[in-house]
């Protein structure tokens, strides 16, 4: 399906529940690159690149998150692939 980029804004109880570390682990398992970070409004932002099918798997996972998380909503923005990332990192 081709290389793409997706930006996610994950809302709910998603900070202090290992959401970033779990997202990094899942993204690496899927072979994705990019980053994940906490936002000041209590949400988590994810920017990921890779094959569209794997990005869709990450989106599905983000709607559940790790067991301690309570995801209320995931806003998804598809973008063009940039190739700017070489791994998947936790920022901030």
Swiss-Prot record:
This is Acylphosphatase. The active site is at residues 20, 38. It comes from the Bacteria. It is an enzyme of class 3 (hydrolase). SUPFAM superfamilies: Acylphosphatase/BLUF domain-like. Pfam families: Acylphosphatase (PF00708). It catalyses: an acyl phosphate + H2O = a carboxylate + phosphate + H(+). One of its GO terms (molecular function) is acylphosphatase activity. PROSITE patterns: ACYLPHOSPHATASE_1, ACYLPHOSPHATASE_2, ACYLPHOSPHATASE_3. Keywords: Hydrolase. Its EC number is 3.6.1.7. Residues 5-92 form the Acylphosphatase-like domain. InterPro entries: Acylphosphatase (IPR020456), Acylphosphatase-like_dom (IPR001792), Acylphosphatase-like_dom_sf (IPR036046), Acylphosphatase_CS (IPR017968). Belongs to the acylphosphatase family.
């Amino acid at each position: 399906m081709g290389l793409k980029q997706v930006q996610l804004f994950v809302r709910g109880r998603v900070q202090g529940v290992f959401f970033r570390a779990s997202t990094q682990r899942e993204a690496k398992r899927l072979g994705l690159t990019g980053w994940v970070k906490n936002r000041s409004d209590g949400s988590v932002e994810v920017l990921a690149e890779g094959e569209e099918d794997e990005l869709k798997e990450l989106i599905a996972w983000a709607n559940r998150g790790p067991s301690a998380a309570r995801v209320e909503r995931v806003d998804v923005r598809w973008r063009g692939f940039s190739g700017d990332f070489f791994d998947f990192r936790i920022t901030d």
